[in-house]
Amino acid sequence: MEQQMYNELVHGILAALPDRVIRIVLYGSVARGTNTPDSDVDIAVFLSARMDRHAEDRLSDVVVDMNLKYDKVFSVIDIEDAVYKKWRSVTPFYRNVDREGIVLWTAA
């Protein structure tokens, strides 16, 4: 069931943000295998460009639908890939995503 859930999330994100997504990464306690039934599902969406308000609304709709369908809290953050590449070696959060992240989808 979890793979189906992740596939559905990836599909929803890609539909909400066409041509912007570079990769989608699961990180945090679920990726580390230290999650509990109450843990949120941390997702980083790496983008080629910033989101406008309409894109933010579409992504929010996907996340809310997933939260309700699976009775989980999906914590989805967007990261502009150029900013990530510039700061990944010095920002602890980015280093954690690199170290523990599981890539759910990547652009070809």
Stretch-by-stretch model annotation:
Residues M1-I22, R32-P37, S48-A108:
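Catalytic core of pol beta-like nucleotidyltransferases
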Residues S29:
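Conserved H-loop
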Residues D42-F46:
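Short beta-strand->loop micro-motif that forms the acidic, two-metal-ion catalytic signature
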